[in-house]
């Protein structure tokens, strides 16, 4: 069964008649549809992230964004795809290729390069590509900023930035040894980052007991 969440696009909308009517229509079409309590206004009031559209890449005929980066990812080239799929484009495609092939693949497949050493989506000073994406897309919420510090420390060997940096580095290197296929590695790492984000959001002050 298909799943859908309907939310009014009007910034002042409270998830009223239009949302509930559309959800009912979708349920009649055999979709599992829900409405967001409070609508767009409720989302904003709760200070949930809103993606800035000005840096969104061009989408393909199926509505997907396509990204390309260097093969054999470890930290950033896994963390950024996680961020994109969870907060920007859940259908995004990622192409992992040899460093010398990144630009050619980007041109041929209309893909957006990231973490390649040059271009817009790359490290800037002490900020890694993950930091750049948070800022450019307007996703600088407290949980994601906490996660960014962990990612930055693991990626740059500044393991003193947060106690969790060493753990993320160890788990990431372990995954890179477990999987020869980059997409399989990315898919396996998604749950790792899901758990780490959930800790950043809800459980940072909780103990194992």
Task: Annotate the PLM regions.
Residues 76-77, 186:
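Active-site-proximal structural scaffolding
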Residues 136-209:
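A charged, amphipathic interaction segment
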Residues 1-8, 14-74, 80-81, 108, ...:
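Rhodanese-like catalytic fold shared by cysteine-dependent sulfurtransferases
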Residues 88-90:
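A charge-rich, low-complexity, intrinsically flexible signal that marks solvent-exposed coils, linkers
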Residues 93-103:
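A short beta-strand-loop structural module common to alpha/beta enzyme folds
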Residues 11-12, 97:
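Short beta-strand segments
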